[in-house]
Amino acid sequence: MYAEERAYGSFDDVMEVYQQIVTESIQLKRLHFGSGCLIEFLGDSGTCETFCGGWISMICWTSDTNSMGSLTVDIGIDDGKYKTYNARGFLLCSKSITSISQNTEGRDRILTVSQENNKLQITFVTLTKVFKEHDIRNLGDPKCIEKFEKECRALDRKKHDDEHRKRSGKQKEKRKVEDTDKKKDDDRRKQEERKRNDEDKQPDKKEESDELPKEKRQKYHDMKRNLEEQSHEDGITLTSTTLVNGAVEGALPPCISIDNHEDQQHDELDKRAYAQGTNREGLSNEDNYGNFRLNKSLEQLRAKLVASSGDIVERSLLKLKECLDNVKDNLIKNECADVTGPSKCLSKTKHIEPKKQIVFSDCVRPVPVCEIKPFIDVRLFETARSPRRLRQRTRTIVGSTDGAIEQQRVISGQNRGRARGRGRGRAPRRRNSNINNSRTQTTIVIDDSSEAENFENEGSFNEDLLATTILETL
């Protein structure tokens, strides 16, 4: 490196005329000085000049992105002379010093301005790269200077071209990267579109597979119908088994009520049958044949159960009729005994009419009549107010399954004439016996409701008879 140009300036009595900030990056300043001195060197020779007065103008530009900038210093003299120094490059600024350095291939420049205490100092240096010794020797020759300047220009152009190539290369690389990114994006979009198209086509395939041929659809329809019939049979057998379980010997026939609960059961069975039919579509022929045999055996078993349940119900009804006949005979015998005896105290019964039907279903527990526990209320002996003869009537009503079997027997005093024909000596004894019989009264209630049977009998004979009849009915 070789210092080709040097310039040093010193100015006194410096005054700032104005300062203008055009933008944040451009500033303008104007100064006046009273006296000054400027020394310049070019190669090995130099000159010195003094000034009595003049002005100095400074223009500074700074970049917004980095520390690059430019600085221009113009010096005007009253005699009509002027000097200019400029440089562009890295800019350094402080409160009193502003410096800029320019770096180019073959030539570097440094320009510094310092202002302090009404004094201004300017320094300007140009550095040049020299490759041969004769260039150094002949540096003061104007021809050599022109040659040197040409070389510097060529170097500057070369540098500019290199920078342009680098920039273009970087741009090409960026374009390649962008192109690859675009290709990747296009590939992704195509793949997504293919997936969407495949997903849109899948439901169509499913619908095609769901559509069965006519033969398969007919088989499926027949299978579904058989399963529905089977489900209805299952519902019938369930009700029959409840009847068999609820039947008790000596009980009245149950009264079945078809309610919403059974309808719900049939709906559930239909749903299960439909689900079984849909699940059986994929079974093989062997499985279908095995299921057919199993269903056939189940149907036979259900038929047997229905027949056996009917037999059991008939047997229970026959036993119930026999028990009712026995009760009827016993009541007739008791009435005959009361009529032939000396006392005319008659028994009196009320007919019990069933107000509520007993419902046998899955949700309601069957409660036959025989399960209603009777209880005997034996009241204290009460004295009768009048010794008159008690006239009583007996009315028995017996209900069966086919209808209410009613039997009414009215026993009146048939032996009144015979009683009148007897001697009068026995009349007091009979009166006493009637009084004693009226005093001993027992009330037997056979139901937990308000309906009751009041039996008024004589002595211990009628009480034992009633107890035996109650046990037989139970």
From Swiss-Prot:
Residues 156-219, 412-441 are annotated as: Disordered. The keyword Translocase does not apply. InterPro entries: U79_P34. One of its GO terms (cellular component) is host cell nucleus. It holds the Pfam family U79_P34. Residues 156-165, 175-219 have a biased composition (Basic and acidic residues). Residues 417-432 have a biased composition (Basic residues). It is found in: Host nucleus. Keywords: Host nucleus. Belongs to the herpesviridae U79/UL112 family. May be involved in DNA replication. This is Protein U79/U80. It comes from Human herpesvirus 6A (strain Uganda-1102). The gene is U79/U80.
